[in-house]
Curated annotation (Swiss-Prot):
Major localization class: membrane
Location of the protein in the cell: Cell membrane
One GO term of the biological process aspect: protein secretion by the type IV secretion system
Organism: Rickettsia typhi (strain ATCC VR-144 / Wilmington)
UniProt keyword annotations, A-Z: Cell membrane, Membrane, Signal, Transmembrane, Transmembrane helix
Biased composition regions of type Basic and acidic residues, renumbered to the chain: 633-647
Signal peptide (from-to): 1-24
Protein known as: Uncharacterized protein RT0031
């Protein structure tokens, strides 16, 4: 009897364990789920947690590809009699987490963050999936195939309104610090998606409360239909004129009409269907196929030629052959981003990879020799500040603080002025390029309206104006880029003189990047060692620092090579001031040269930051002068009274004097001139 009871208990425990094991495969889906390139959604967001709370494969039969519904098991609270609850939903059904988790589970249905998330059944290619909204668009948490041999298509995971490169664009750059190239590519793909290819946003949200407006591409499609109808009427009127008037029946006019008509049709409404980059079927349009790439690619091509023709020997010169097809324009922006980091002492751009953490080195670039710099080991410097050992630190400002602690205010002011002017001018170029690119996309979008105007004499002036704006916006960034290339060339020569740079190429997966290490030239190496850039790199490595007490606290400052550093930095500052004043008129110069609109009104002013600093200094100076005037000694009051009495007797002279003082006070309180 006892043996039979023990056998029953063993069987019950075994069945329960098998049941629990059969439902323990949470996170399993009938078909593979898409994985984001960075793994962010699966690891750090609620999306990954919801995936690990759903089981599809157990119990068996949920992966049937011939049913139009999806069956899944949603996790219950720990300690429940059943590990999960089974639900079956059809395509288009939507349920909140709180509706699926009804057992007061604090991690799901009772969680204030997760309970209002809506799960919707929808198709992703050949899969029927249970999807949830994420920051990168709807993403599936459980899927099953609708046929026996599903096509290997992965659903898009990027935001429906934003280009994919906004998330993965940094992978196409060869510079460890990259933001300008990423901004350009992100904006380009986003504009392309908004204006031409359309987006993947549904017309209504999941609650069916908000109806989104039609995409720009839809509106342009209707616009092209109207233009096509107008062109048909134009052809009919030309045929009537040719039939009624023999002057229109000449071979010359007919040939000219055919050429102009084909030109207008091809560049305005397009010919023949074509798969565009977004995968949507559209007509082949001359403006999209030839005009837009030509207009947007003129600036980086022109500037890259100037960059390669000058500059320091090997500094921030990347291998163009390693850029992927369609992303070679990153070479210009990588050169700019790299110099920003190098001038400001970002150590990630310097070859500090002793332990191989950056990836596998695949070789060295041309320029520079392989002889290491003597006495340039940062690990042997004990007196250096702790901030110099932090990865990714901008060491330039740490060194400037060291000069401040040693009392060299002029070096600090000159260094800050150089960095502010340099960053202001580069920010102006980036914003100018982006504004011109947006203008080109807008002009391309409305091209179906302006291109047909070339057919009529009365409207041809509008077409000429449209062409002028397009060409000007394509050439203006090229002119400004030439100015930036000249600026950087002068900086390289003034900061590093004849120093050489050795490039280290690395690969980590599909990502390729490079670092640069300063090398002494084989001829006239003393000139390189006396340069401002070489001495700054020595300060970055910890040389030239001394520790002393300030009251009761130990501080670290720089007291070596102060005179030579000041002379070299003032030389760099002279170039900065020259380009600062020239940058005020570069926008107007580019507009006059290209006979187009001036973009300075909608771009970041190259002198904006400096002007704000000047206004702040003027305000502080005027405030201090007013404060000093308000503290007049008490014994001076009788003199003030006598002055007022004399002022009444003098009449007009007193009024003029008082008016002048009031004017000075008003200008002081308003932040007057220095």
């Amino acid at each position: 009897m006892k043996t039979l009871k023990a056998l029953k208990i063993f069987i019950i425990v075994y069945i329960s364990s098998v049941s629990l094991e059969s439902f323990a495969g949470f996170g399993e889906s009938c078909s593979n789920l898409p994985i984001t390139s960075d793994g962010y959604l699966e690891t750090y967001t609620a999306y990954g947690y919801i995936i690990r709370s759903i089981d599809m494969k157990d119990p068996r039969g949920n992966c049937n590809p011939y049913t139009s519904s999806i069956t899944f098991c949603f996790k219950n609270v720990e300690g429940s009699t059943s590990p999960c609850t089974i639900y079956t939903l059809n395509e288009g059904d939507a349920r909140k987490i709180s509706d699926l988790s009804t057992d007061n589970n604090p991690n799901l249905g009772a969680n204030t963050v997760l309970k209002n998330i809506v799960l919707t059944v929808k198709k992703f290619g050949n899969d029927l999936c249970l999807a949830m909204p994420t920051s990168r668009g709807p993403m599936p948490v459980a899927c099953k195939s609708l046929n026996a041999t599903p096509a290997p298509t992965n659903p898009k995971y990027e935001n429906c309104n934003i280009g994919k490169s906004c998330y993965t664009g940094a992978n196409y750059s060869q510079s460890l610090i990259n933001f300008s190239g990423l901004a350009v590519q992100c904006l380009s793909e986003t504009l392309n998606k908004i204006f031409f290819t359309g987006n993947s946003c549904s017309s209504q949200d999941q609650n069916s409360r908000i109806t989104h407006l039609a995409a720009f591409s839809t509106f342009q499609g209707y616009l092209k239909r109207i233009i096509g109808a107008a062109l048909i009427l134009y052809t009919m009127f030309f045929a009537f004129n040719m039939a009624l008037n023999k002057e229109y029946a000449t071979t010359e006019k007919i040939t000219l009409f055919i050429i102009k008509f084909l030109f207008v049709v091809y560049f305005s409404i397009g010919l023949e269907p074509l798969n565009f980059s977004g995968g949507q079927t559209v007509k082949e349009n001359g403006m999209l196929k030839y005009g837009l790439p030509l207009l947007t690619g003129a600036a980086p091509d022109f500037a890259e030629m100037i960059f390669n023709a000058a500059g320091s020997r090997g500094l921030c010169q990347f291998d163009n052959s390693k850029y992927k097809d369609g992303y070679k324009f990153y070479g210009l922006w990588d050169a700019i981003d790299c110099r920003i980091g190098y001038y400001l002492g970002l150590d990630l751009l310097y070859n500090i990879d002793k332990n191989g953490i950056l990836g596998h080195s695949v070789g060295n670039g041309p320029g520079g020799n392989n002889k290491p710099i003597p006495n340039f080991d940062p690990d042997s410097k004990k007196d250096r500040p702790h901030d110099l050992s932090k990865a990714g630190a901008l060491r330039f400002f740490t060194v400037m603080f060291g000069f401040l602690m040693s009392g060299h205010i002029i070096i600090l002011v000159a260094g800050i002025a150089f960095s502010v002017i340099f960053l202001s001018i580069l920010l102006y170029f980036i914003t100018h390029y982006l504004v011109c690119m947006i203008t080109i996309y807008v002009m391309t979008y409305i091209s179906p309206i302006f291109i047909p105007m070339v057919l009529f004499t009365r409207t041809k002036a509008y077409f000429d104006g449209w062409v002028k704006v397009c060409i000007s916006c394509a050439l203006q960034p090229a002119v400004v880029a030439g100015f930036i290339a000249l600026l950087i060339t002068m900086y390289d020569s003034a900061i590093f003189k004849n120093c050489e740079f050795l490039r280290y190429d690395y690969e980590k997966g599909d990502i390729r990047f490079s670092t640069f290490e300063l090398r002494l030239p084989s001829i006239d190496a003393d000139k390189c060692q006396e340069s401002f850039g070489y001495k700054m790199l020595k300060y970055y490595a910890g040389e030239g620092w001394e520790e002393h007490l300030l009251i009761l606290f130990p501080i670290k400052s720089i007291v070596r090579d102060v005179v030579s550093i000041l002379a070299e930095l003032l030389c760099v500052l002279v170039f900065s001031v020259i380009f600062y004043y020239f940058s005020k008129s570069i926008g107007r110069f580019a507009a006059d040269l290209t006979n187009g609109p001036n973009m300075d009104a909608v771009t970041a002013s190259p002198t904006k930051i400096v002007d704000l600093v000047k206004k702040g200094a003027a305000f502080l100076q005027d405030a201090s002068s007013v404060h000093a005037q308000g503290k007049s000694p008490v014994e001076d009051k009788p003199d003030i009274g006598s002055k007022r009495k004399d002022g009444v007797q003098q009449g007009e002279d007193s009024e003029n004097s008082s008016g002048g003082e009031l004017a000075d006070l008003a200008s002081g309180s308003g932040g007057g001139k220095l």
